[in-house]
Amino acid sequence: MALLSYEGWLFFLRWFHFLSGITWIGLLYYFNFVQTPFFAETDPPVRSGAVQKLVPRALWWFRWGAMLTFITGWLIILHRISPGGFFVGTYGWAILLGGIIGTLMWANVWFVIWPKQKMVIQNAIDVAAGKAANPAAAAAGQRAG
């Protein structure tokens, strides 16, 4: 297989999709199984420092892992669609269903989790600077996971 061909392009797309998906879902496991229990048992000053410095970095990789997985997934689907070919069997429909579910997951990251986490991070920065706490930040943190 020549890497500078149509099949080579699909090869790279699949690998970028695979690696970015591992990044995205791996960080999701980190948030759920490592960070959340850690925050539950830490002292407030430690938690505040982690929210200000660690969480934004982890969320950056989480968000962009989701974005790259989303983009490469739809590029793979668009490259595989051909007149009368992709949706003839169950394979194409199964991949399309996966793409729709992945799109919903991506939208949750970008339009639910990230805006709520921005509020939580900004609240931690404001409180550390001596400003008043945002009462909506606690609820946003619960909603965003």
Predicted segments — roles?
Residues 1-145:
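Polytopic transmembrane helical bundles with strong interfacial aromatic enrichment
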